[in-house]
């Protein structure tokens, strides 16, 4: 089945060295995750608790979100509700516009990416500076993230070095990662000192305290919010957890699953506005309530955006993030894209081997592979099933329901072994594009059994 994904994957694989590096690097992250998880005896218990907590939270959103809002307001924060991406973007713009902000610093937020916040604000004349190193690199290169945790994983240090030569005046030909990191830090430091406002996403929102929690390894969220008096934070409504005790379960799982480290370098809790400042918090739906009403796919809301499913997925590792048409790639992106607009993102459904590795590593036990399988069953209902596959399946059904024809086909099948190669390996044989076809046995198992050759 030729899809946008398969064509983009073929382009990605043309650079064999880059493709191999991408595959190996992400597998190393998966291996680190395995080592760290084995050091925690109660790892599976934590996963079960995370899944149960998420299912509870998502089935009690009406209570927990209101509890969060009341506590956040009591803490001195302003709280807004956005039903979709347009409302979210306009709320952010109105806050910035009311304060006369023309440029601000922003930490990593997949919600902002989902709602295309940056292009919207830039169209209004507001400069957005990404403070996460990977996001900053991509911003300067005018590219989108290819991974939800490691956004620039597909970019080699030589490319970064050449970019910094143009944008920051670094030494020509110096591609040392430490040098490049220091150069980026020096460049960003100037942005941190005089921002008019700062914005963060949120990994978690705690209902019982009205606080948001942001996990970073670079400390960029803290740096960004340390100076300006105006802080904006936004999160998808599924990020809510009941209390700090529940939060502890997720912080133990998040970093181990995402990058194979015990905990992120910085776990920052934002509860109140700084003295003389303002804290504005936006709770976003943007289709999440629709997922909540879908019993087959409700577990998708369990996702904590750790990226473990991408690190382990053999298809993602070998095809790259840009081969997917939805802004989030990998197994979780396949499901989210189908929940968002199935007729637009259906081609991603084929980008899965159904090895179930994604389901096995998910810290919140999202049944990713099971859901992808369900989406495949729905392709025919959507009118998007592969026609050739349907014809072949129909032919197989016809033959399997007629023993005489089936046995005759088995008897004559070995003749194919002697056919010219071009008749077997052609455009109709997708399987043979990357594989050697197995030879047909001269004698079927059924015949051998009848003759007493096998017992």
Please provide the spans of the model-predicted regions.
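The feature marks the mature, well-folded catalytic cores of soluble enzymes
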Residues: 1-296
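Intrinsic disorder at enzyme termini
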Residues: 1-26, 392-455
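Helix N-cap / loop-to-helix initiation motif
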Residues: 84, 309, 367-368
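Predominant activation on well-ordered alpha-helical scaffold segments within soluble catalytic domains
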Residues: 118, 245-248, 252, 307, ...
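Ferredoxin-type iron-sulfur electron-transfer modules in oxidoreductases and energy-metabolism complexes
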Residues: 266, 274-300, 316-425, 433
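Extended amphipathic alpha-helical segments enriched in small hydrophobics
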Residues: 306-310, 355
């Amino acid at each position: 089945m030729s899809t946008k994904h398969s064509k983009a994957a073929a382009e990605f694989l043309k650079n064999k060295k880059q493709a191999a590096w991408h595959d190996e690097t992400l597998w190393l992250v998966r291996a680190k995750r395995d080592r760290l998880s084995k050091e925690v005896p109660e790892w599976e218990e934590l996963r079960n608790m995370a899944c149960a907590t998420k299912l509870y939270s998502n089935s009690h959103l009406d209570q927990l979100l209101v509890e969060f809002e009341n506590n956040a307001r009591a803490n001195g924060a302003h709280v807004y509700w956005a039903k979709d991406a347009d409302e979210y973007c306009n709320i952010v713009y109105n806050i910035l516009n009311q304060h006369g902000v023309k440029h601000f610093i922003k930490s990593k937020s997949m919600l902002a990416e989902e709602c295309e916040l940056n292009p919207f604000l830039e169209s209004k004349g507001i400069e957005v500076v990404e403070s996460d190193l990977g996001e900053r690199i991509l911003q300067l290169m005018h590219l989108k993230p290819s991974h939800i945790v490691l956004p620039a994983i597909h970019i080699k240090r030589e490319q970064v070095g050449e970019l910094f030569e143009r944008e920051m005046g670094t030494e020509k030909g110096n591609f040392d990662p430490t040098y490049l990191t220091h150069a980026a830090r020096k460049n960003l430091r100037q942005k941190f000192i005089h921002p008019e406002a700062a914005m963060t996403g949120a990994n978690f929102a705690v209902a019982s305290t009205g606080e948001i929690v942001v996990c970073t390894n670079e400390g960029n969220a803290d740096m960004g919010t340390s100076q300006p008096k105006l802080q904006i934070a936004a999160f998808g409504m599924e990020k809510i957890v009941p209390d700090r005790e529940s939060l502890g379960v997720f912080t133990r799982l998040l970093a181990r699953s995402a990058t194979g480290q015990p905990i992120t370098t910085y776990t920052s809790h934002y509860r109140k506005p700084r003295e003389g400042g303002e804290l504005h918090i936006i709770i976003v739906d943007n289709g999440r309530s629709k997922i909540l009403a879908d019993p087959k796919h409700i577990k998708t809301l369990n996702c904590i955006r750790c990226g473990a499913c991408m690190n382990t997925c053999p298809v993602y590792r070998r095809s790259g993030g840009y081969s997917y048409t939805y802004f989030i790639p990998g197994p979780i992106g396949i499901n989210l894209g189908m929940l968002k607009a199935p007729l637009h993102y259906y081609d991603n459904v084929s980008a899965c081997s159904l090895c179930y590795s994604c389901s096995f590593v998910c810290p919140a036990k999202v049944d990713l592979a099971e859901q992808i399988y369900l989406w495949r069953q729905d392709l025919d209902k959507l009118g998007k099933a592969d026609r050739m596959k349907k014809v072949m399946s129909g032919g197989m059904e016809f033959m399997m329901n007629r023993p005489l024809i089936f046995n005759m086909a088995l008897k004559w099948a070995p003749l194919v072994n002697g056919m010219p190669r071009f008749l077997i390996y052609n455009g109709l044989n997708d399987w043979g594009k990357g594989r050697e076809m197995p030879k047909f046995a001269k004698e079927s198992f059924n015949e051998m059994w009848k003759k007493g050759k096998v017992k």
